[in-house]
UniProtKB/Swiss-Prot annotation:
<keyword id="KW-0472">Membrane</keyword>
<dbReference type="InterPro" id="IPR050569">
    <property type="entry name" value="TAAR"/>
</dbReference>
<feature type="topological domain" description="Extracellular">
    <location>
        <begin position="89"/>
        <end position="106"/>
    </location>
</feature>
<feature type="disulfide bond">
    <location>
        <begin position="21"/>
        <end position="185"/>
    </location>
</feature>
<feature type="transmembrane region" description="Helical; Name=4">
    <location>
        <begin position="151"/>
        <end position="171"/>
    </location>
</feature>
<feature type="transmembrane region" description="Helical; Name=6">
    <location>
        <begin position="252"/>
        <end position="272"/>
    </location>
</feature>
<dbReference type="InterPro" id="IPR009132">
    <property type="entry name" value="TAAR_fam"/>
</dbReference>
<dbReference type="GO" id="GO:0005886">
    <property type="term" value="C:plasma membrane"/>
</dbReference>
<feature type="glycosylation site" description="N-linked (GlcNAc...) asparagine">
    <location>
        <position position="18"/>
    </location>
</feature>
<protein>
    <recommendedName>
        <fullName>Trace amine-associated receptor 2</fullName>
    </recommendedName>
</protein>
<feature type="transmembrane region" description="Helical; Name=2">
    <location>
        <begin position="68"/>
        <end position="88"/>
    </location>
</feature>
<dbReference type="InterPro" id="IPR000276">
    <property type="entry name" value="GPCR_Rhodpsn"/>
</dbReference>
<dbReference type="GO" id="GO:0001594">
    <property type="term" value="F:trace-amine receptor activity"/>
</dbReference>
<feature type="topological domain" description="Cytoplasmic">
    <location>
        <begin position="217"/>
        <end position="251"/>
    </location>
</feature>
<comment type="function">
    <text>Orphan olfactory receptor specific for trace amines. Trace amine compounds are enriched in animal body fluids and act on trace amine-associated receptors (TAARs) to elicit both intraspecific and interspecific innate behaviors. Ligand-binding causes a conformation change that triggers signaling via the G(s)-class of G-proteins which activate adenylate cyclase. May also be required to provide olfactory input into limbic brain areas to regulate emotional behaviors likely via modulation of the dopamine system.</text>
</comment>
<keyword id="KW-1003">Cell membrane</keyword>
<feature type="glycosylation site" description="N-linked (GlcNAc...) asparagine">
    <location>
        <position position="277"/>
    </location>
</feature>
Amino acid sequence: MASFEAQQETFDCSEYGNGSCPENERSLGVRAAMYSLMACAIFITIFGNLAMIISISYFKQLHTPTNLLILSMAVTDFLLGFTIMPYSMVRSVENCWYFGLTFCKIHYSFDLMLSITSIFHLCSVAVDRFYAICHPLHYCTKMTIPVVRRLLLVCWSVPGAFAFGVVFSEAYADGIEGYDILVACSSSCPVMFNKLWGTTLFVAGFFTPSSMMVGIYGKIFAVSKKHARVIDNLPENQNNQMRKDKKAAKTLGIVMGVFLLCWFPCFFTILLDPFLNFSTPAVLFDALTWFGYFNSTCNPLIYGFFYPWFRRALKYILLGKIFSSHFHNTNLFTQKETE
């Protein structure tokens, strides 16, 4: 805190209110409504994804390579809800960052890391579904648990190294005129990407993996269409497995679509803002960020709607049956679903 105060003495902070929080122009009713909506989203994000984590971890029937990827993605969403969204809620409603400059960087690093980690997970899931549907005979040898673990290592380590490296080196702000004064004097936890890093983040962290996902799912659904024409002539067990794989691909394709819908506006704004002389209103950027956060709220709702086994697992968790001995061997699939 002392270094922050020293910076304020070095710069003329009169334009920025000398680092103090501006008077909140929102009425008490508006703030209460914002807190209620955001707290509800945080609650669903934390406990919905926690239920998914417990379900896949506890029930042995769910220990598959695909579900291991979904488990890790649920951990990503849970961490976003638990460690990022509460602080962002206070900043958004109160129009002020109360937690200091160092924690601002830590917070933004985790925020950036988790959003990129999510898209890396979705790419991995797309690859998993590609082998399951397009190359089913090779699936068991290509998508083994050790392979999935290596994929998860990449999904977490690369975004983490990128996010913390860029934010703490402050490379993202090189060449931005007046940024030092803004950081020293502002009370809003300002993070602004220059043209180079804004473009790099959009291309490497969003556009390229998104394009890969869309291409892979396009191939998956093209192959699924071919399978649909011959599926009735297949042996019953192979027929049923293909139907299950197709349904799983459809569900995870919806998860991918919701992710792209929620996060594209935020990433696109990060790309454009430095070319528009950082003219994006703070309120708009804040709203787009929360629109991205809501993706992590939507995921457990999507799983609950499309996966009957998740609804059953949630019921068992709420009833406390998971504390019974040997309950982890319970069958979560009906006869119709396993056929």
